[in-house]
Regions:
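Compositionally biased, intrinsically disordered or flexible polar/acidic segments
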Residues: 6-163
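GH16 jelly-roll
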Residues: 162-410
Length: 410
């Protein structure tokens, strides 16, 4: 059960504690209550702002802040790993370099030199999210100043795992094997020619010409311009590949990564993502989806990370971020990752975070459903509503090379 006044769930299996810089409980846009932080905060002073904070539907969680050297001692029900989500915004007009602080958890620096203005700009929601191993009944957090005074609007803490173990890899595929061989049995090919509501041009096959190991430690998913009629009788103008780990590898929460070299070319749409195990048929989007990396060939320097879920009326929503690299991502291998925790998904490129989709920021009516097991998907689509159609410059073949995929948990 949940106490609306306290903002704390009492069920240890799904325990959460939500605290905000306020003298009274606050309700976010999704209807969840956040308790005043006085019971857990030490130091700092409450500062109120009327700044219009962008990037969130719950600006009150960012407008009121605790500023100054501050620490938190948060009681937790059991030893284990906890997700810590700090809700931050620069509402005081500080310029880059004028408010810089370290975030420590359990005495260890977990996020050094946080400068919210430099990260996202002024009056915009930002998040520092870490997974913390707690071995006793209290989670210790500290915001330690480097320049100026730290400022935090709210703290969200959630139990991830009651197993008191450090982050460790539970799945690691380096795609070793001879050229032309099928990938590990964890990856199962999906076949057929009706995808993307009929807007995509490819038929997915299990042929080695579309999906196989390359003999050099890579998985190759290759799209080919060719007429192909599949068993269902549909004829498509391209073939390609889609692999899923459903029924073989599923997980709830973790850090998922892939090192990939993506293709360029108008109309090509490589993606690495996670799909809810119950997503078949009409159950999408209710089962949830995390797009770790989506790229389109005509914009090869940009990568997008998104989450998808249902609205209160049953339609789908998408929320995410885009990162533009200094040069084309098709020129070499890059690591695309997502840190999935109970109330957030943080996307990164080559180890640098570029955006967090957070439950606290969703508008009313957008449901957060990312609390059930998901499995991995790798695919290379052609065309569709987002990628657009190939054109005269599009090469007739394109290959998504995957060097490694990993899943880490606690």
């Amino acid at each position: 059960m949940q106490s609306a006044a306290l903002g704390v769930t009492a069920n240890a299996a799904t325990w959460q504690g939500r605290y905000c810089a306020s003298t009274a409980a606050v309700r976010d846009a999704g209807g969840r209550m956040w308790a005043p932080d006085a019971a857990v905060a030490r130091g700092g002073q409450l500062v109120r702002s009327s700044a219009a904070v962008a990037g969130t539907s719950s600006p009150v969680l960012y407008q009121n802040q605790r500023q100054g050297p501050v620490s938190f001692a948060i009681p937790v029900p059991t030893a284990g790993t906890y997700a810590v989500d700090l809700l931050l915004a620069e509402t005081g007009g500080a310029q880059p370099g004028q408010r810089v602080f370290d975030v420590l958890a359990e005495g260890t620096v977990r996020a050094p030199s946080i400068d919210v203005e430099a990260r996202v700009g002024g009056a915009r929601a930002d998040h520092v999210v870490v997974a913390v191993l707690v071995t006793d009944g209290r989670l210790e957090l500290q915001l330690r100043p480097r320049v100026g005074v730290p400022a935090v609007g709210a703290v969200d803490v959630a139990l991830v795992s009651s197993t008191a173990t450090a982050e460790h890899t539970v799945f690691d595929d380096t795609f070793a094997g001879p050229a032309g061989a099928a990938p590990d049995a964890a990856w199962q090919p999906q076949t057929g020619g009706r995808w993307g509501g009929g807007a995509e041009l490819q038929a997915y096959t299990a042929r080695a010409s579309n999906v196989s190991l390359d003999g050099s430690g890579h998985l190759a998913l290759t799209a080919r311009r060719e007429s192909y009629t599949g068993p269902e009788g549909a004829t498509n103008s391209y073939t390609s590949a889609r692999l899923e780990t459903g029924g073989r590898l599923s997980f709830r929460y973790g850090r998922v990564s892939a090192s990939m070299r993506v293709p360029a070319g108008a109309g090509y749409w490589p993606a690495f993502w996670a799909l809810g195990d119950a997503a078949g048929g009409a159950q999408w989007p209710s089962a949830g989806e995390i797009d770790v990396a989506e790229l389109i060939g005509q914009r090869p320097a940009a990568v997008d990370g998104h989450v998808h879920g249902p609205t209160a009326t049953g339609t789908a929503y998408g929320s995410g971020y885009e990162r533009t690299a200094p040069s084309s991502l098709a020129l070499g291998f890059h690591t695309y990752s997502a840190l999935w925790l109970p109330d957030s998904v943080t996307f990164s490129l080559d180890g640098k975070d570029y955006g967090t989709v957070d439950r606290a920021d969703l508008p009313a009516g957008q449901r957060w459903v990312l609390d059930q097991p998901e499995h991995l998907v790798l695919n290379l689509a052609v065309g569709g509503s987002w990628a657009g159609a190939p054109d005269a410059s599009t090469p007739p073949t394109a290959t998504l090379l995957v060097d490694r995929t990993t899943v880490a948990r606690w």
